Regions:
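Residue-level signal for inorganic ion chemistry
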Residues: 81, 114, 141-145
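Active-site beta-loop-alpha junctions enriched in small/polar residues
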Residues: 62, 86, 116-120, 147, ...
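Hydrophobic/aromatic residues located in beta-strands of well-ordered beta-sheets
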Residues: 5-7, 111, 173
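Anion (oxyanion) recognition and catalysis
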Residues: 25, 102-106, 136
């Protein structure tokens, strides 16, 4: 499509990390903003779809103490910054995530937030609520699954999720439901 892409992340200096970096290079995605940490292993997440196209996950991780030690790419107006998952909530990475989102807002980039909140973190939902709200405040677009919001808020009704949890912070909301519908909510559409 001719659009320049930057990927900000981290990986270990191991076979998994090398596969990831080579895949990125093979697909013309620069690796300049991927922190390759020398101690620790590349995290691996495996997703298995059930008969309803809902994913079940297994996570393997062994992180070093120093994380996300990268320089951010140049960000310009109307660039799209995608943040999400526990990565955007992790207290260890929070300062770097906030730095990125502050730059994005200052430069008038579009922040797209996908909570991707998994069942493995549902017991932390209350503790993570202030960070989730902060991400919603930075977001120009929020996109999540019914499953995400169920684990975050215990709610499965799209309209209630939008009105009670999203709209105040971000007026543009997309909600998926596995193989079912995709719902769009805005100030003008409900």
């Amino acid at each position: 499509m001719g659009v320049n892409v930057c990927f900000i992340s981290e990986t270990g200096n191991d076979h998994v990390g090398n596969i990831i970096l080579q895949f990125m290079r093979d697909n013309h995605i620069p690796t300049d903003h991927v922190n390759v940490f020398p101690d620790g292993k590349s995290p691996v997440s495996l997703a298995f779809l059930n008969e309803h196209s809902d994913a079940e996950y297994i996570f393997y991780k062994d992180y070093p103490k120093q994380r996300l030690d990268v320089l951010f790419p140049s960000i310009n107006e109307d660039d799209i910054i995608v943040i999400g998952s526990y990565y955007a909530l992790n207290p260890v990475l929070r300062d770097k995530i906030l730095e990125l989102m502050d730059i994005a807002k200052e430069k008038r980039a579009i922040v797209y937030y996908d909570p991707n909140f998994r069942s493995s973190h549902k017991n932390e939902a209350m503790k993570l609520a202030p960070t989730i709200i902060e991400n919603l405040e930075y977001a120009d677009i929020v996109r999540g699954s019914l499953e995400d919001f169920y684990y975050m808020y215990g709610i499965k009704d799209v309209e209630k999720i939008y009105k009670d949890k999203i709209k105040f912070y971000c007026p543009l909301f997309l909600c998926t439901a596995g193989a079912e519908r995709i719902s769009l909510r805005t100030n003008a559409i409900s």
